[in-house]
């Protein structure tokens, strides 16, 4: 005879409703952490070079899958990742009256299939590695979650159901308004502090402007190629204007609104057409031949200012936005690791650096966040080709760094928001994960608020106007105010996308906490609950 698990006494279905919530949260977390950034490359050569169904990456040697290296810490995290999934799934299976052994078998099978599906999809994500070891460790994690449910699942569900009833009783409109005012007040202050770390407040005023090398003057970092023009702005350039500027061809015309502009025509010293920055003259071994259509760099010489560009640093600290455009042509792309542009001193980290690394372009600029624990360079692949001109523009609005090349904006952006600042306090952040940190940060801020609003929503099922006011004041207004606060800090532009993200996260929290509830009926009070 099959024994059904004992449900929560106060609400016969309330306890096991949490199995749905835990399972939804686990699946969402697993998909985000394993498939981010959700950019799939279904290249034909991958399918011919390896078998994705057997999780074999190209380069398989002696029966071993190349590129997948894991240690004990990775295995532990893979197990831990699937524990909530196994816990929630076991609750759903046991609610249907299945035996503990049946629940264990079903959880292991579902965990293995889910993990395999993820590993299969990771095969088509360039920054991810697939491997059977992840399937094994994830399946073990699902089993551990199932065993945890067998041991303490009902007690956990009863505890969560009791907490839910207490919060629901507390979540009157008045109490919710007071809590949210205090809650968002704290988050606004924390977010403003974190956002300030993306400003250009720590730029050195005594740095030199160098083209073709860095201020250290090391021959190993000297660049080979040709530069036609260089421009600076102390503001971000709108996307349409940036596309227009970089699609003009080489050498492109100088923009009349630029703060500083060099066209490298004629003979050195090259003057700034706006007379804002000092002239650039040759350093190292002065080249014997010159080109009237651009400055030629042979790896032994480079251009540098004799005086620091202190006014540029002061302007960037004040705004604090910038844009830089350079039109250049590399001589070669094999075995190259050289500086094309640098605002730097003879020693120490530069203010800004743009370098060629084979065919890749690497960009870095100084701010309090990028100076902590990791260099946070942005590497953009396959930008250069030998003896082909590239019109390049970077634009930074105080939070997002955008890249334009030859009239096209690259899809990915380098996003420095409060999420990156919070992540830096916890771990060594990675440039490829910057956008993901923002999603996590907005979830941390707005999902809990959405849960509280979801409790309040239950109390007004027959009040359309009251619900409308709740949506405007509870879901929409905090997200708008949050973006305004970060804008008022003075280091980022207002983003409608971020406002929408905050609203979406709040709605997700409200929907999640109401999983299994019939919101058309009023919430029963404790006095109306079934007797024990």
Where are these regions (language model features)?
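Short tryptophan-centered beta-strand motifs in secreted/extracellular beta-sheet-rich domains
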Residues: 324-326, 387-397, 401-403
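Membrane-interface loop-to-helix entry segments
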Residues: 58-87, 132-140, 433-449, 497-504
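Interfacial helix-loop-helix junctions of multi-pass membrane proteins
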Residues: 112-143, 195-199, 476-510
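Short, aromatic/His-centered strand-loop micro-motif at the edge of beta-sheets
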Residues: 365-391
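Extracytoplasmic low-complexity segments
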Residues: 170-231, 235-319, 344-348, 356, ...
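Extracytosolic (periplasmic/ER-lumenal) interhelical loops and adjacent juxtamembrane/interface segments
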Residues: 35-76, 409, 413-434
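Membrane-interfacial, low-structure loops and terminal tails that flank and connect transmembrane helices
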Residues: 1-16, 93-103, 153-172, 459-468, ...
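Glycan-recognition/cleft segments
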Residues: 339-367
């Amino acid at each position: 005879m099959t024994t059904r698990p004992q449900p929560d006494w106060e609400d016969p279905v309330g306890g096991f409703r949490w199995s749905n919530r835990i399972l939804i949260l686990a699946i969402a977390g697993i998909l985000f952490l394993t498939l981010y950034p959700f950019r799939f490359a279904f290249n034909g050569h991958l399918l011919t070079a390896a078998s994705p169904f057997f999780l074999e990456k190209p380069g398989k040697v002696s029966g071993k899958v190349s590129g997948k290296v894991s240690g004990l810490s990775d295995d532990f995290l893979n197990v831990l990742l699937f524990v909530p999934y196994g816990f929630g799934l076991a609750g759903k299976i046991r609610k249907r009256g299945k035996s503990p052994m049946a629940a264990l078998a079903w959880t292991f099978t579902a965990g293995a299939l889910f993990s395999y599906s993820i590993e299969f999809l990771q095969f088509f994500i360039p920054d991810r590695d697939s491997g059977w070891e992840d399937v094994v460790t994830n399946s073990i994690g699902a089993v551990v979650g199932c065993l945890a449910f067998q041991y303490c699942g009902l007690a956990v569900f009863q505890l969560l159901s009791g907490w839910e009833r207490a919060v629901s009783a507390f979540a009157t409109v008045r109490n919710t308004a007071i809590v949210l005012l205090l809650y968002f007040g704290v988050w606004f202050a924390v977010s403003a502090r974190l956002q300030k770390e993306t400003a250009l407040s720590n730029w050195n005023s005594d740095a030199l402007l160098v083209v073709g090398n860095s201020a250290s003057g090391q021959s190993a970092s000297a660049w080979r190629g040709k530069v036609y023009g260089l421009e600076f702005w102390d503001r971000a350039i709108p996307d349409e204007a940036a596309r227009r500027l970089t699609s003009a061809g080489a050498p492109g015309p100088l923009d009349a609104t630029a703060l500083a502009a060099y066209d490298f025509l004629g003979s050195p010293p090259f003057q700034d057409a706006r007379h804002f920055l000092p002239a650039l003259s040759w350093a190292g071994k002065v080249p014997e031949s010159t080109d009237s259509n651009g400055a030629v760099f042979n790896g032994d010489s480079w251009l540098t200012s004799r005086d620091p560009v202190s006014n540029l640093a002061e302007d960037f600290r004040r705004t604090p936005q910038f844009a830089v455009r350079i039109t250049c042509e590399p001589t070669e792309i094999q075995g190259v690791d050289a500086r094309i542009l640098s605002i730097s001193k003879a020693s120490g980290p530069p203010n800004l650096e743009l370098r060629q690394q084979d065919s890749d372009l690497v960009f870095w600029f100084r701010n309090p966040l990028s100076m902590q624990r990791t260099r946070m360079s942005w590497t953009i692949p396959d930008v250069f080709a030998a003896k082909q001109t590239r019109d390049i523009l970077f634009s930074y609005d105080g939070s997002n760094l955008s890249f334009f090349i030859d009239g096209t904006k690259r899809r990915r952006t380098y996003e420095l928001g409060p999420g990156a600042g919070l992540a830096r306090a916890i771990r060594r952040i990675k440039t490829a994960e910057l956008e993901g940190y923002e999603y996590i940060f907005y979830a941390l801020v707005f999902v809990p608020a959405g849960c509280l609003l979801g409790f309040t929503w239950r109390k007004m099922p027959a009040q359309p106007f009251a619900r409308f006011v709740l949506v405007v004041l509870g879901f929409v207004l905090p997200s708008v105010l949050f973006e305004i606060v970060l804008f008022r800090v003075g280091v980022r532009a207002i983003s409608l996308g971020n406002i929408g993200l905050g609203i979406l996260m709040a709605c997700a929290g409200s929907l999640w906490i109401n999983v299994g509830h019939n919101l058309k009926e009023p919430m029963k009070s404790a006095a109306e609950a079934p007797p024990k």
